[in-house]
Amino acid sequence: SVALHEALPGDYLQMARAAMLDLPAFRRQGWFDAYGEGWATYAESLGPQLGFFTDPFSRFGQLNEEMLRAARLVVDTGIHAMGWSRRQAIDYLNAHTANPPQDNEAEVDRYIAQPAQALGYKIGQLRIAALRERARAVLGARFDLRRFHDAVLGNGALPLDVLQRQVEGWIQAEKAAAKKGVQAPAPKATPAAPLPAAAATRRE
């Protein structure tokens, strides 16, 4: 899960792809948690297709990561909207994940210090997965997973509502191209300056 999330096809691929786009620097190097961490969390779900999670231990680790990202939705909301105490939040993570208690304590302290940041992982993953199913339903046999991924990554980091409009535009372009018997063009990418080193320091 960590390799898929942090490297390929997760954060590293997303940021490297953005750095190559023919966009202003602030767009190539921009960041939205729900998009970036959502993509990286979605990338973990591609593991079985890429030959990962073939043994019970790695599969268990992947499932625990899924549970943690889902539990964050409950705990962060509990702390910042429902009046939960730190102890309540830690107890919830201890009951609903396989993480060591000390890890869950650190997780909760993170949520307290950064309200809503950890929500982006699961929210972004769910939105990208929903867009994928939308594209598959509309395009049918025309749907190409690689081209869908390029549509998601092809404009750099975006707010989720903007991403949804971007993908919807791609779906319509694919439909129109299918009627003409041609392939819709992919977003243009050109070499660009590398990302700043700070981009690789976010904690998962």
Segment roles from a protein language model:
Residues 1-204:
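N-terminal maturation segment of proteins
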